[in-house]
Structures are given as structure tokens and as C-alpha cells.
Amino acid sequence: MNLIWGFLILILVLIFLGVFFSFVPLGLWISALAAGVSIRITDLIGMRLRRVPPGVIINSLIKAHKAGLSEVTLDKLEAHYLAGGNVDKVVNALIAAQRAGIPLTFEKAAAIDLAGRDVLEAVQMSVNPKVIETPVVAAVAKDGIELKAKARVTVRANIERLVGGAGEATIIARVGEGIVTTIGSAESYKEVLENPDSISKTVLAKGLDAGTAFEIVSIDIADVDVGNNVGARLKMDQAEADMRIAQAQAESRRALAIAREQEMKALTQEMRARLIEAEKEVPLAIAEALRSGKIGVLDYYTLKNIIADTAMREAISKLGQKEEEGRKD
């Protein structure tokens, strides 16, 4: 009977130890004590209950302790992890900042990490500036010649402006705008080709890093190429447009002239019809004059001779015009 009770107690002890060691990573606790980090067993159990991986927190705390970061505590690391932050990266960034002599607190590093920035990369960029290449920027000088420029922008991360500061895209856009402004204000494209550093000096003096997460160290023009003669092309396009406008105006005047000609022809036909209608009244008037004795028979024949003579002259005149037109043809 005692043997059975002893066996049951052994089983219960083994179950208790299994549950205990599942909650308490004993090896991690020993490692922390060996590194001089004071950790209570209850802290490890609490992390398990809060579903916080003790390995991530304890190892980061050991690194911070060995680096002399006294401000980093267990509660801060656990709170940052529960907020969705990257504890290991924050501690590595603090160590790198301390070695480089960059003032960076845990709260600032945690805020940068929670803002979605890579805090470790930001610290490294503060020590080793990063080079950003802009795409080819095309601009036109005052003489109408297009220039295509490409720049290299050396930037250093500004730790104080990482939260809420604009990113690389803003730097590239502002540098491109500065290049366009500088080339556009040049009297001749030759001025830019002779002094390409004038672009970088002008752009750098504009303070383009205001409101961004970076500090511009230098702007270097990598390449400047001559593009199209935009001014000449615009003049050609303008001349072609003017020619089309003139052609349209000429066509409009021609249409008006044709319409006027047709109108005059219609008016001529109308006048001719009135003339014929009036000529129909002449014989009646002559007959009435003969009947009333206003003219005599001799006067009548004299009038007929005049009419015949006029008709003959008109016929001869028309014949002469036809012969002259035939010679011209």
C-alpha cells in the first residue's frame, strides 16, 4: 500500500515539475542570473500567462545590461512587445546609438519603431549616410533646348524627425523640382553644361530637407544630357497652326466669294427678267403712239433701223470677243 502511495506521489511530483518547467524556462533564468540580470521566477510565469515569449524579452534585456543601458527595464521591454513593437531591433538600435555617440532614449526608439520606421536602419544611416539616386529629370532652358539631368542625393537620417517626417519620395520630388527650376531659369543650355555644379548649389541652398526625416548632406549631378530642341519644335507647331488658321480663313473668304457670285448671278437673272418684261411693253407703247398720232410712220421706221443697227453692233461685238478668247486658248 505504501508503495502505491509513493508511486502516486512520484507521478504527481513529475506532473507538477512538468507544468512548472513549461511555465518557467529554467535555462533562461540561469542565463539571466549568470549575466547579472535580476529576474524573478514570478516574472517568467507572468510573461507566460500574458503570452509574451520570455526568450525574446530576457535575451534583449541581457544585451542591454551588458551594453550598459540602465534605462532599459523588463517592464519597458514587455510593454513595447505587447504594443506590437520589435524589442530586439529597438535594443540593437540603442546599443548602436550609444556606440556612435548619438543621443537616443528608449522611449524615442520605441516611438520610432511603433511608427513603422526601421529604427536600427535609421541609426545606421545617421552614422553612414545613404545615397539616393533620382530618376532622369527633363527641363527646358530659356533658349528652348531640353536638358536631362540625373542627381545623387546623400542623406543622413534625422532621428528627431523620424516620427511624422516625410520619406525618400519627398526628397526625390523636391530635388527634381529644384533641378527643373534651375535649368528653366538658365538663359542658355550651355551655361548649365559648363557649370553643372550650379544646379547642385542652387538646389542645396533651397533647404529641401525641411519637414522630412532626413538631412541632406550633398547633392551631386551625376549626368547631364542634351535632349530635343523644344523651342524650335514649338515654333514649328505654332507656324503650322498659323498656316492652318490662314488656310481656314482663306477657305472661308473663298466660300463667301462664291456665295456672293451666285447671289450676283441670281440678281442679274432677275434684272434680265425685268428687262424682258419691260421690253414686252415697248411694241404696245409704239402701237399706242401710232394710234394716237404722237409719232408718224417715218419715225417708226427710223426707230426700227436704230434697233436693228444696235442689234447688229452687239452681234459683231460678241463675235469679236469669242475670236479673242479663242486666240488666248
UniProtKB/Swiss-Prot annotation:
Location (main, coarse): membrane
Coiled-coil stretches noted in the UniProt entry, renumbered to this chain: none
Compartment list: Cell membrane; Membrane raft
Membrane topology designation: Single-pass membrane protein
One family name in Pfam for this protein: FloA
Keywords (A to Z) from UniProt: Cell membrane, Membrane, Transmembrane, Transmembrane helix
GO CC entries: membrane raft; plasma membrane
TM region positions: 4-24
InterPro entries the UniProt entry points to: FloA (IPR022853)
Family statement: Belongs to the flotillin-like FloA family.
Described purpose of this protein according to its UniProt entry: Found in functional membrane microdomains (FMM) that may be equivalent to eukaryotic membrane rafts. FMMs are highly dynamic and increase in number as cells age. Flotillins are thought to be important factors in membrane fluidity.
Subunit (UniProt): Homooligomerizes.
Protein name stated in the entry: Flotillin-like protein FloA
Source species of the chain: Dictyoglomus turgidum (strain DSM 6724 / Z-1310)
